[in-house]
UniProtKB/Swiss-Prot annotation:
Protein name per the record: Probable protein transport Sec1b
Residue ranges with Basic and acidic residues bias: 490-503
GO molecular function terms noted in the UniProt entry: syntaxin binding
PANTHER family named in the record: VESICLE PROTEIN SORTING-ASSOCIATED
GO biological process: intracellular protein transport; vesicle docking involved in exocytosis; vesicle-mediated transport
Database matches in SUPFAM superfamilies: Sec1/munc18-like (SM) proteins (SSF56815)
Length: 659
């Protein structure tokens, strides 16, 4: 029996994609520092600290590390056996405690390894270089001492984080710690800059301008994008003289924004497969834990990584859960129809179950891995659809999106709170947060408390609403800038819409109208239509920069977004299989599109301070196909709704909500 690639998803691997460039730097520049002199027997030991091991884990597979000549991976701070006949590669953060351990390994009469190739993840301070040079016994044993400038987590083919999970609270809290504030800005800027050092890209840096014009009255947190942009610009500008072959003119664009510009995206129910996995299932990062039934014994607990090395995941992650479910059903039926052994294990030709598929795995070991993946995703999709029904998410999602597009107001919110008595407290709060963003006047005075009582939510849940007010402030002039913050507390009372209907939206599936604000920003940036007064540049864009019409665009007055027109609701949950779906899969662009990026346009980087969302990660993949430019999303972290809401509450917990 022959199997087509489409049955299980097609693998995608293109060296020009962002994360693959990071992987290649590690495999070639770091793990094979002396490759011209090496033989097949030149095995080395790789030693890392707790941070760099995570950089490595996101960028490479263990098999790739082994293929690069690494026989053993060790923890810097764990006791290690001496291997004086082998060379060691150290990949470390430039911290004093790391350097002390390194010198302890390599100094004295009996070093642990023959020679040390030392790579630091970011620029090493001069005092640490001097500290190394002062140990005369170590110097002859150093084969290389380099700065890799690779201090970020490549969490996605087109996404990275700087590992600042608490940046939202550290930078935006009403009771922030000044030292922690400054340290966070500094380390975040350094790690962002290393992405450009790794890719040898010199960015034109733009940022969300402060709402206030008076530095004396502008809240400190409102200056965060500007301060971060300044710090990044200072670092990358120095690369022109410190990194060989680093560009002298801008080769790409970096837009720095922050979470307050779009607080709907982190709380609204997103209906794509990836987002629903992280919203509804118990996930540990990209790790999904599940149980497999075993005949005559206890269920076996297993773990699965939902990431780019799983071709089915790549195909399904950014499409609607209903579409993903249909595709999985079709793949399963297609597999069974092509295989007689599989037909024997199905139930009288009826609908095949996951248990049937497990029997097929045993009967057809040659297809074990593929069928196991298919079984896994069928189980995941089944769980998600079960939760959608049990939690009544279709009705909740409809009200959420109608609020966002101006098609619902108090009547619909009150109605669903009264009719759905079994709605979870978390979903009630998410709905009320969206309501507060679109209709802030409904939470003035004691109105918010009354809504909380109607929803039967505890008083302390108001911390989330108070934080929204705190982030926007009470100055109407501050909150009314076109294209800026969508939340307008104390603004004129009128029917609001937080989004304007898009002509290119996918109406095939219900609940597909919502899009993150960065989608509009990226499109405007790509066209050179992003106003410079709202998103200033750290420098005048060079003539070689893609979208050189920005200067002209800056002279045009910014147009306020029109109010949303009432749109036709998508009446059905399902679509016909032959209808077009513009978000069907990103695998084709990953396989074939990168040559087009190089030919048609420079990269665009967007950095979201305070945590990005799954929908924003999906957006950069979608726009990469649409704009024919590789879009890379960076952030301090990737947050799912519960994480964001917890952080939101912390901003003003205890009533510290003075602006």
């Amino acid at each position: 029996m022959s199997m087509s690639g489409s049955d299980f998803g097609a693998p995608c691997d293109d060296p020009k994609i962002f994360r693959n460039i990071c992987r290649d730097r590690i495999l070639k520049d770091l793990l094979q520092p002396d490759k011209d002199k090496e033989t097949k027997s030149s095995w080395k030991v790789l030693i890392m600290d707790k941070f760099t091991v995570r950089i490595m884990a996101y960028a490479c597979k263990m098999a790739e590390i082994t293929d690069a000549g690494i026989s053993l991976v060790e923890d810097l701070f764990k006791r290690r056996e001496p291997m004086p006949s082998m060379d060691a590669i150290y990949f470390l953060q430039p911290l004093k405690e790391n350097v002390i351990m390194l010198l302890s390994d390599m100094s004295g009469r009996c070093p642990l390894y023959r020679k040390a190739y030392i790579f630091f993840s970011s620029p090493i301070p001069k005092e640490l270089v001097s500290y190394i040079k002062n140990d005369s016994s170590v110097i002859p044993r150093i084969g290389a001492l380099r700065e890799m400038n690779l201090e970020f987590f490549a969490i996605d083919m087109q996404g990275f984080t700087t590992d600042h999970d608490m940046a939202f609270t550290d930078l935006y809290s009403a009771q922030h710690n000044s030292k922690k504030f400054n340290d966070t800005i500094s380390t975040m800027a350094t790690r962002i800059a290393t992405t450009f050092a790794s890719l040898k890209e010199f960015p034109c840096v733009r940022y969300r301008a402060p709402k206030g014009t008076d530095p004396m009255t502008t809240p400190k947190f409102d200056m965060v994008p500007k301060w971060l942009a300044t710090a990044v610009w200072d670092i990358v500008s120095k690369y022109k003289s410190t990194i060989p072959e680093f560009p002298q003119k801008e080769t790409c664009e970096l837009l720095i924004v922050d979470r307050p510009i779009d607080q709907i995206a982190p709380v609204i129910h997103e209906w794509t497969y990836d987002a629903m996995c992280h919203d509804l299932l118990e996930m540990d990062g990209q790790k999904y834990i599940y149980e497999v039934s075993k005949a005559g014994s206890e269920p076996e607990r297993k773990e699965a990584l939902l990431e780019d090395h799983d071709p089915l995941w790549v195909e399904l992650r950014h499409i609607h859960i209903a579409d993903a479910s249909e595709r999985l059903y079709d793949k399963m039926n297609n597999f069974v129809s092509k295989n007689k052994a599989a037909q024997l294990h199905s139930r009288d030709g009826g609908e095949i179950s996951t248990k049937d598929l497990q029997k097929i795995v045993q009967a057809l070991p040659q297809y074990g891995e593929q069928v196991e993946k298919l079984t896994l995703h069928i189980e995941i999709a089944g769980k998600i659809n079960k939760f959608i029904r049990e939690y009544g998410l279709r009705d909740i999602g409809q009200v959420e999106q109608d609020l966002v597009f101006g098609d619902a107001a108090a009547k619909e919110v009150i109605s669903i709170l009264r009719s759905k008595q079994d709605m979870s407290p978390e979903n009630k709060l998410r709905l009320l947060i969206i309501y507060a963003i679109v209709y802030p006047e409904k939470f003035e005075g004691d109105k918010g408390e009354k809504l909380m009582q109607l929803a039967k939510l505890p008083h302390d849940e108001m911390d989330a609403i108070n934080s929204l007010r705190y982030l926007v402030g009470s100055d109407t002039k501050k909150a009314s800038r076109p294209g800026g913050f969508s939340l307008k507390f104390d603004a004129q009372k009128k029917k609001n819409a937080a989004r304007t209907e898009r002509q290119d939206g996918d109406e095939t599936w219900a609940l597909s109208r919502f899009f993150p604000l960065i989608e509009e920003l990226i499109e405007k940036l790509s066209k050179g239509a992003l106003p410079l007064n709202e998103y200033p540049s750290m420098s005048e864009p060079s003539s070689t920069e893609q979208g050189s019409t920005q200067s002209a665009a800056a002279t045009k007055p910014a147009q306020a977004q029109p109010m949303s027109r009432r749109s036709r609701r998508t009446p059905t949950w399902a679509k016909s299989r032959n209808s077009d779906d513009s978000q069907s899969s990103d695998s084709s662009v990953l396989r074939h599109g990168s040559n087009d990026f190089k030919r048609l346009g420079n990269r665009i980087f967007v950095f979201m301070i305070g945590g990005a969302t799954r929908s924003e990660l999906r957006t950069v993949h979608k726009l990469t196909m649409k704009l024919k430019r590789e879009i890379v999303l960076g952030s301090s972290s990737i947050d799912d709704p519960p994480q964001f809401i917890s952080k939101l509450k912390m901003l003003t917990a205890g009533g510290a909500n003075d602006v």
